[in-house]
């Protein structure tokens, strides 16, 4: 995570691409960015994500002490309800997209199915990240979201590619579904491959639900107790 005093690298996508290119494609970073003003404003209003990360993680470098003092983690029933509502809405979206991918059509679009499945996985990831971290990402790349989820869960392993070419191709199609649909208009993945991706997505969403339910039970005890 970077907290910076200016806006030049506010967009994590640009920064991550620059690092990737300047290291001859040897290093991939998955960065969370705040400007100094954003961070200080959030700390003022009791941001549990920043309070947790800045308190628990290792500080690699700090230029000065312009970042405000952290408060304590905020436990409150209303905080729990906010987390629970956020998860329920994300899970609702994930199930919606996943169910839409199963509709039988006379003229199916397998490229379109990958895009729908990508949306389903993204929504489940965004929900998990909020449940575990209370963080709302402003960047929605599938590899990025899966990597964030990997910091607290093994669920991304369901989606990550295995050694086979078919598995790696399926993962690539899920990650680049929007680009493929717009740019590779002549390419038509097989229906059997897209159905396998659909099955993986279903497994991922169900596993994410179990992880979220377990974490929500823990959070409920903490927030209601305090």
Residue ranges, per PLM feature:
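Short beta-strand-to-loop capping motifs
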Residues: 2-7
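Catalytic core of pol beta-like nucleotidyltransferases
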Residues: 9-226
């Amino acid at each position: 995570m970077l907290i910076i005093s200016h806006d030049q690298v506010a967009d994590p996508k640009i920064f991550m691409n620059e690092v990737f290119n300047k290291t001859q494609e040897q290093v991939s970073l998955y960065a969370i960015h705040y400007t100094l003003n954003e961070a200080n404003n959030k700390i003022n209003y009791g941001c549990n994500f920043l309070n947790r990360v800045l308190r628990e993680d290792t500080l690699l470098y700090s230029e000065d002490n312009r970042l405000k003092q952290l408060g304590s983690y905020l436990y409150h029933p209303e905080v729990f309800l906010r987390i629970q509502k956020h998860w329920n809405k994300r899970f609702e979206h994930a199930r919606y997209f996943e169910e839409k991918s199963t509709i039988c059509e006379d003229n199916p679009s397998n490229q379109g199915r990958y895009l729908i499945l990508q949306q389903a996985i993204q929504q489940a990831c965004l929900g998990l990240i909020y449940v575990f971290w209370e963080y709302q990402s402003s960047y929605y790349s599938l590899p990025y979201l899966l990597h964030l989820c990997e910091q607290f869960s093994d669920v991304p392993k369901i989606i990550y590619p295995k050694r086979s070419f078919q598995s790696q191709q399926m993962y690539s199609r899920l990650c680049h579904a929007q680009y493929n649909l717009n740019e590779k208009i002549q390419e038509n993945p097989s229906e059997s491959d897209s159905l396998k991706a659909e099955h993986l997505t279903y497994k991922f969403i169900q596993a994410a639900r179990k992880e979220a339910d377990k974490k929500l039970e823990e959070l409920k005890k903490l927030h209601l107790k305090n």
